[in-house]
């Protein structure tokens, strides 16, 4: 099981008028949940930036790879969220900040589904924090 969740979407900087502003200003409390429990729970997560990275990865990903490795422009820490091929179509899910050891790999399909659901929800819930032009651009990148 893998779930990418968020709540309390906000933008302390106001309405994003440019793409880079949407990537970094639209934040939420973010949680990665796996079978064992909460792998990662972070406030002020750049949800739009992660959605764009996931959308780009989904365009090229298959059961064999490549791995997904997310590092935010807003943080020096690398590997804030990653998915790595493990064996027999299974993938490991982790983070540099993970709160527990994730011993149960996820299927590629579970990861795809979790990423798609996350992107879809970000598209809906972040629109009010972007200008119409930026929202259209973000929608086309993540489509």
Predicted regions and their residues:
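Charged, low-complexity, helix/coiled-coil-prone segments
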Residues: 1-3, 54-67, 128-138
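An exposed acidic His-Trp-rich patch
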Residues: 68-106, 110
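Compact, well-ordered interaction domains used in eukaryotic information-processing assemblies
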Residues: 43-75
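A short, compositionally biased
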Residues: 23-29, 65, 85-90
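N-terminal low-complexity, intrinsically disordered segments
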Residues: 1-48
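Mixed-charge, glycine-accented linear interaction segment located at domain edges/termini
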Residues: 97-143
């Amino acid at each position: 099981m893998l779930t990418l969740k968020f709540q309390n979407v906000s933008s302390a900087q106001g309405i994003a008028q440019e793409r880079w502003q949407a990537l970094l200003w639209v934040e939420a409390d973010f949680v990665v949940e796996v079978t064992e429990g909460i792998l990662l729970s972070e406030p002020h997560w750049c949800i739009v930036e992660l959605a764009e990275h996931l959308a780009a990865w989904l365009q090229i990903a298959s059961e064999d790879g490549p791995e997904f490795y997310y590092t935010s422009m807003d943080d020096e820490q690398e590997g804030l969220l990653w998915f790595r091929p493990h064996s027999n179509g299974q993938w490991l899910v982790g983070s540099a900040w993970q709160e527990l050891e994730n011993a149960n790999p996820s299927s590629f399909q579970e990861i795809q589904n979790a990423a798609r659901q996350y992107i879809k929800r970000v598209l809906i819930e972040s629109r009010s924090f972007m200008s119409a032009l930026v929202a259209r651009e973000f929608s086309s990148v993540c489509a």
